[in-house]
A protein has these predicted regions:
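Bacterial N-terminal signal peptides
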Residues: 10-20
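Beta-strand-rich interaction surfaces with strong enrichment in secreted/lumenal proteins
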Residues: 60-64, 129-134
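Residue-level recognition of well-ordered beta-strand positions that form the cores
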Residues: 75-77, 92, 144-146
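Beta-strand acidic-aromatic groove motif in beta-rich domains, primarily in extracellular
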Residues: 84-93, 157
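Short proline/glycine- and polar residue-rich coil/turn motifs
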Residues: 111, 133-139
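Localized edge beta-strand/strand-to-loop motifs within extracellular or lumenal beta-rich domains
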Residues: 137-151
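Short, surface-exposed ligand- or partner-binding patches at beta-edge/loop junctions that are enriched
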Residues: 149-168
Length: 193
């Protein structure tokens, strides 16, 4: 029969393990976004896009996946990626090392299949160590940023979505919600190394 000292030692050890254990972080995330959940507003209206646009296919996210190990890779699949309207694909990143967000964007002008890539760290430095690729045939946009570019954080959380501007309207879709928030996109879980 264990003595009081060994029982106390076991309890203290269990407590220390429970308190110091790191939260579980997945190395990858996959998900679906409802088709037909695009929301719109007039471009001169200063409110959240609320008008449902179930027939709007361009910029409508249907699936996404993200992995993080040697690089952060986020692939987003759309119902349609035809070169219609001004298209903005944006990502916000939170990392284990930074107090503020990273901002990432691929801006594609009307009628084009390529755009301008922007990566800005939390200190407002514009970096050139990542890329985003638009593949209209596959209906995907893929973001890739090496972990070293992100300063090798233990984990990364990703929020992303798309906006298309056409005909005097803004059409928005958040990858993880059936609606659109007032600011930014909805974050996914921690992706850990």
């Amino acid at each position: 029969m264990p003595g009081p000292r060994s029982t106390l030692t076991a309890l203290v050890a269990a407590f220390v393990l429970a308190v110091t254990a790191a939260p579980a972080a997945a190395a990858e995330e996959e998900g679906r976004d409802a088709a037909g959940d695009v929301r719109s507003r007039g471009v001169s209206v200063d409110t959240v896009p609320r008008h449902p646009e179930p027939q709007r296919r361009t910029g409508d996210i249907v699936r996404y996946g993200a992995t993080y190990d040697a690089a952060l890779v986020v692939t987003t699949k759309f119902r349609d990626l035809a070169a219609r309207g001004h298209q903005e694909f944006t990502w916000f990143l939170r990392t284990s090392q930074d107090e503020f967000e990273w901002y990432v964007a691929l801006i594609v002008p009307p009628g084009k299949n390529r755009g301008t890539f922007t990566l800005i760290d939390p200190d407002a430095n514009q970096l050139d160590c990542g890329r985003a690729v638009l593949d209209c045939a596959a209906r995907t946009v893929t973001l890739r940023i090496p972990a070293s570019c992100l300063r090798d954080p233990a984990w990364v959380r990703v929020a992303h979505g798309a906006r298309v501007y056409a005909g005097g309207r803004e059409f928005s879709d958040d990858a993880r919600r059936d609606t659109v928030k007032a600011a930014g996109w909805t974050y996914g879980p921690q992706l850990g190394q």
